Amino acid sequence: MKPLKILISNDDGVFAEGIRTLAIAAASRGHEVTVVCPDQERSATGHGLTLQAPIRAERADELFNEGIQAWGCSGTPADCVKLALNELLKEKPDLILSGINHGPNLGTDIFCSGTVAAALEGTLEGIPSLAVSIASFQWRKFKLAGELALNIAENAINQKWPKKLLLNLNIPPCDSEQMGKPGWTRLSIRQYQEQFSKRKDPRGNAYYWLAGEAVKDLESAGDGPKEWPSDVSQIETNSPSLTPIQPDLFWRGNVNDLPKLN
């Protein structure tokens, strides 16, 4: 295929190994790669935007291979994509990639994910966009994930990427010999046991650390072929999960179940 203009962002920051691996893999295929991502980790910021402070962007080419233009941005992941599309890039990219995230973005966790938000910003602008994550916080072998993400994105572009489609790719933490084939999945519904750790600062004032863990993954009752597994169950089989997402959050239940308006 002809070289693509690719914008890459993330929420783990400009120093993260995942984004560096993805950018280098894309450039090695002959694509024109630009990185615009947070200057430090900004995980779990969702689609937040910076409105009460200026946004600064500094060149960070030295962190990547020759030929890759890079900026570290003081804003959120969504800020980074907005800034890139409206100020930093001379031309609209053909593709936006977000990741490789250092940890999973499965099920309803996507609503908190800065990685998914960066890709969603591209989808809202009508640009083919894919978020890619390793489904483990400890796994640090990113090369296979980068190649798989590029294969899927290039294939989707060759087949004419549907409008308003965001692809969310999660990759199991295993080597290629143990990994199954990628498959289409539905979003699971993740339920957490939320916990706050209450502490006191040196002046005796209380503060809190949020901690929690997923205690239940429910099958979604929403749209999607029923034969598709959930993204969580797909990962549990050591197979990459690919979930099609759209920005339209309109409720699709029975309108007769809605509360009556006075």
Curated annotation (Swiss-Prot):
Going by the UniProt record, its keywords in alphabetical order are:
Cytoplasm, Hydrolase, Metal-binding, Nucleotide-binding
Q: Which one of the record's GO molecular function terms can you name?
A: nucleotide binding
Where would you find this protein in the cell?
Cytoplasm
Query: Where is composition skewed (Polar residues) in this entry?
Result: 231-244
- Cofactor needs: a divalent metal cation
Metal-binding in keyword set: yes
| Amino acid composition bias (Basic and acidic residues), ranges on this chain | 220-229
What family, per the record? Answer: Belongs to the SurE nucleotidase family.
Query: What Pfam family is a match, any one?
Result: SurE
Chief place where the protein resides: cytoplasm
Q: Where is this region: Disordered?
A: 220-246
Gene name, per UniProt, is surE
Q: This chain belongs to which protein, by name?
A: 5'-nucleotidase SurE
InterPro entries in the record: SurE (IPR030048), SurE-like_Pase/nucleotidase (IPR002828), SurE-like_sf (IPR036523)
Please state what class of enzyme this protein is.
Answer: hydrolase
Q: Which catalytic reaction applies to this protein?
A: a ribonucleoside 5'-phosphate + H2O = a ribonucleoside + phosphate
What this chain does, per the entry, is described as: Nucleotidase that shows phosphatase activity on nucleoside 5'-monophosphates.
Can you cite an annotated GO cellular component? cytoplasm
Locate the transmembrane regions by residue number: none
- State where a divalent metal cation binds: D11, D12, S43, N101
Q: How is the cofactor bound?
A: Binds 1 divalent metal cation per subunit.
For this protein, the Enzyme Commission number is: 3.1.3.5
